[in-house]
Amino acid sequence: MDQKRLTHLRQLEAESIHIIREVAAEFANPVMLYSIGKDSSVMLHLARKAFYPGTLPFPLLHVDTGWKFREMYAFRDRTANTYGCELLVHKNPEGVAMDINPFVHGSAKHTDIMKTEGLKQALNKYGFDAAFGGARRDEEKSRAKERIYSFRDRFHRWDPKNQRPELWRNYNGQINTGESIRVFPLSNWTEQDIWQYIWLENIEIVPLYLAAERPVLERDGMLMMVDDDRIDLQPGEVIKKRMVRFRTLGCWPLTGAVESHAQTLPEIIEEMLVSTTSERQGRVIDRDQAGSMELKKRQGYF
């Protein structure tokens, strides 16, 4: 990696660490959302650097839908144990009672009940006034216009027309009782930055990001990896082993794989250099309707 690129990554690292420390000093009860993906892994690594040699001054929160890949759950628990992090796991009890699932109820309802409502329940339950998230501006157009400190009202709603200025890296974290801030320390990073930093810092990631032979089927223009037996095959569908990996991770019925032979970090980085599509092309929830991500964020989604 050339010196110019290395300096760029260190500048991003310094900015993110500054934001994380600022939130820890300014807010009474912050939390770090941990979705187990590559961005969460980088964000956790930066947080550990920010407070080294001490421990994290806030817990990790995973809003569990019950439909993550099995490798993600194993990685989550191993990571929390390895680093001695306090891990909070919340699953929407009403959604569980109604047996909400993406196959029967669709991606929009599943996401709203198990993710958005589940997140709001957890934030209310523990009284968190600031929540870190790993979203980046290059991922999606609604995230591109969101501030690093994203103000949310007492119902956790985001109003894109009522955002606060962030001049010269000065962040306004003043809130009233019941209000909160979502904080995005990786806002200025790109997917390429994330992968190069993972390689530079030797950060462990879920193996699903690396290409391997996996059982997949084609459905609705997406390569779906069959992770357990909760799927009913439709007429003509056949499960086949193919060399695939994931650019983004979520609930397995709603996350498409991509055909790839990139089995190492340098190979992934090389693959990203020639990619012309967004990593979120494989996320079914982004296809629900035009502007679906912004609508979800207005309702309280991260």
From Swiss-Prot:
GO terms for molecular function: ATP binding; sulfate adenylyltransferase (ATP) activity. Keywords: ATP-binding, Nucleotide-binding, Nucleotidyltransferase, Transferase. Its EC number is 2.7.7.4. Pathway: Sulfur metabolism; hydrogen sulfide biosynthesis; sulfite from sulfate: step 1/3. It holds the Pfam family PAPS_reduct. The keyword ATP-binding applies. Gene3D superfamilies: HUPs. It catalyses: sulfate + ATP + H(+) = adenosine 5'-phosphosulfate + diphosphate. GO terms for biological process: hydrogen sulfide biosynthetic process; sulfate assimilation. It comes from the Bacteria. InterPro entries: PAPS_reduct_dom (IPR002500), Rossmann-like_a/b/a_fold (IPR014729), SO4_adenylTrfase_ssu (IPR011784), Sulfate_adenylyltrnsfr_sub2 (IPR050128). Heterodimer composed of CysD, the smaller subunit, and CysN. With CysN forms the ATP sulfurylase (ATPS) that catalyzes the adenylation of sulfate producing adenosine 5'-phosphosulfate (APS) and diphosphate, the first enzymatic step in sulfur assimilation pathway. APS synthesis involves the formation of a high-energy phosphoric-sulfuric acid anhydride bond driven by GTP hydrolysis by CysN coupled to ATP hydrolysis by CysD. Belongs to the PAPS reductase family. CysD subfamily. This is Sulfate adenylyltransferase subunit 2. The gene is cysD.
